Amino acid sequence: MDRYPTIESLINEARARIEVTKAELDEARRRRAGIAAALASEFPGSRHYVNGSVAHGDALTPLTDVDLGVVIPNPEGHYGPGKKGPGELQERAAAAIRRGLADEYGHLRVEFRGRKRSIRVSFRDPIREGLPDFTADVIIAIDFPDGRGLYIPRFDSWDRADPETHTALVTAANRRTESVYARTVRLLKHWNRRNGEVLCSWNIKALALTCVDSKEALVTTMRSWFNHAVQELRKGGTEDPARVTDRPIKLNAPRAEVVKRLEDALAKLDKAIMYDRAGYPTLAQKELADLFNDPDMLEAPPKDAVLRDGVRFHAPQGAPSRAFGAPVIAQTGAGPAAATPAAATPVRSWAP
């Protein structure tokens, strides 16, 4: 396993600050179970599936939503592309949720008309005082008749998808990596939120499925993900990991902009790694703080300490060398990109 003198502990401390609490998870699961019970009563023989951050183990605090799907029997084949759309089933599901939860949540609001995919359940009752409203996104689905996956709503029609396989793939990755996959995704989701949110959460997870596959240091797995994401998105969009649709996962910004943000983030992380291994933890912390762009999660060191270490770094007697561990790193492959003292200036780099 790669060793990092100080930044791995900084990353783990930062991760703990954004990790969802057990109380939040317990309450979210309780509310999700109430919706599932209401839907099971309305649709005998149905099955439900869970997905999203709570199911995948990568939820951030504060937790404000949960996801649930219900697969409704369609033995006569009345529903599907070229047949009935999802509206009738969504209306029944919405009514069942209202009946099942109204006694506990007197201001409950359930909406589906005009929405692309989900029924939105607004509890109007935060799971903790001071938080925004808690919501649930509920997907009604039918089995794909000729193979793997489901049909899920797309406004008044249907799209093929396989959210059950998605959750199975994530669960397997968490088991294989002893939850390093989920911890890495949580950090990347927070980075994404604080830096333009150019990727949806599922794109982050899908990319991680092919590069975060063992128990490694979080700095290593984050670095592997940024490198992999840059390479893949330069070529095109991210494919569906379940391989049931040919459409790539949608980006939230032009692809060139997304790639540029990823390249900049990779450069900051590489500088943090280089400083850390060279014995300049203050400069390494500054690069990590710039990367995440959230002082509540990871605070930048004092400016005078950064300037002092910057002077020491650039002084001839303090310049990194192989003698005390500064890495000589190739530009290609999974390892950190090459960084030289001239490139590693102690100033704010690549401001988001």
Model-derived segments and their meaning:
Residues 1-9, 240-352:
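Terminal (often C-terminal) interaction modules
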Residues 1-50, 55-63, 74-88, 341-342, ...:
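N-terminal regions immediately upstream of nucleotidyltransferase
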Residues 34, 86-147:
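Conserved catalytic core of two-metal-ion nucleotidyltransferases
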Residues 69, 110-112, 118-123, 150-160, ...:
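Flexible, surface-exposed loop/gating regions in the mature catalytic domains
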Residues 135-183:
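Acidic/Ser/Thr-rich, low-complexity mid-to-C-terminal regulatory regions of eukaryotic proteins
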Residues 168-214:
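A long, hydrophobic alpha-helical segment
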Residues 198-239:
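Hydrophobic, mid-to-C-terminal alpha-helical segments
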